[in-house]
Amino acid sequence: MSADESNIICIEDDEENIEESGVKYSDKLPVCQGSSKILCRSSSQEVIQENERKKRGKNYAVPSILDDFFGVYCLLSRSPNRYFKNRCYIGYTVNPNRRIRQHNAGKEFGGAKKTDHRGPWDMVCIIHGFPNSVSALRFEWAWQNPEKSRRLRLLNLKKRTSETAFGFRLRIACHMLNSDPWRRLSLTFRWLLPELEIPFPLDVLPPSHIAVEHGAVTKISTLIPQLQEEYDVAGTCSLCLKPILSISELLRCHANETCKSHFHMRCLSKHALNAVDEYRTSLFPIQGQCPKCGVVYLWGDLIRDQRILLAVNKFNSSSTLFNMIPRGKLIKM
């Protein structure tokens, strides 16, 4: 094994229990690293809904659903053994706080074979915001195997002499974020341990629409509205004026507290792609502008909102609220 190869573990997919978003009642996952949390601004509608819940009684449990989380992370070994120290491991998770504990606890506690007895490990960064687990797992595999990925192999990415193992992995990730199909996703690059942060390569910075954040990941839940007046019908598409028959084909304007427009997914995608002359070359836009109110949105944010609407509708499947659309912005906690 060469010196370069000794610093990078050839990673195989590790087995992990994939959690599905289910209904929970106001519970949060413990934060393993740091204390930074994702905060949400309150609106007048949120204050009204909060007051309504207080009126129903202090012991009233408001049902909620866990928002989807699909992330691909990079670990860095702090092993006292110089043979393992500073090696990197790339993995996929739906719960980074739990996953780092598993890696450091060992294989018998759910950690991966390639990290067993080679730590302790630090989870330095994670890229999240993927629309589904398949998309995240494909990103994980390409990050692990850039020389095999048809999206990256032509770049012939090699570790530079002055480059650390993590620096090389960061450069690969930046190339991926600038390559199809990942450059079209509204992802977040999160530094979990800011003290280990290093500058992005100047020749391949992340795209401007990729958010760069710091601090630990906090699982977010969405409260499910319980009142009939908090819902509306799907109605008609604001572009083609035809009925929207299913929530699976519905997208809401990002400014849904003030703009009540609903769209067919295909209609809004076509509108945004035509605006940048990409309709014949792309399936969906990176971002767009609401044709009614003019607010700028990221396509990935609308898809995440749609997934939450589908989960809310599944919860309401046995009630009169089935196939109804929540009004305004949903409350996060």
UniProtKB/Swiss-Prot annotation:
GO cellular component labels: Slx1-Slx4 complex
PROSITE patterns, per database record: GIY_YIG (PS50164)
Protein EC: 3.1.-.-
Protein localization: Nucleus
GO molecular function term, any single one: enzyme binding
Co-factor requirement: a divalent metal cation
Zinc finger regions, SLX1-type: 237-293
First-tier enzyme category under EC: hydrolase
Record domain GIY-YIG: where: 68-157
Keywords, ordered alphabetically: DNA damage, DNA recombination, DNA repair, Endonuclease, Hydrolase, Metal-binding, Nuclease, Nucleus, Zinc, Zinc-finger
Gene Ontology BP, a term: embryo development ending in birth or egg hatching
Family per similarity comment: Belongs to the SLX1 family.
HAMAP family: Endonuc_su_Slx1
Oligomer and partners: Forms a heterodimer with a member of the SLX4 family.
Chain's role: Catalytic subunit of a heterodimeric structure-specific endonuclease that resolves DNA secondary structures generated during DNA repair and recombination. Has endonuclease activity towards branched DNA substrates, introducing single-strand cuts in duplex DNA close to junctions with ss-DNA.
Protein's name in the database: Structure-specific endonuclease subunit SLX1 homolog
Protein's organism: Brugia malayi (Filarial nematode worm)
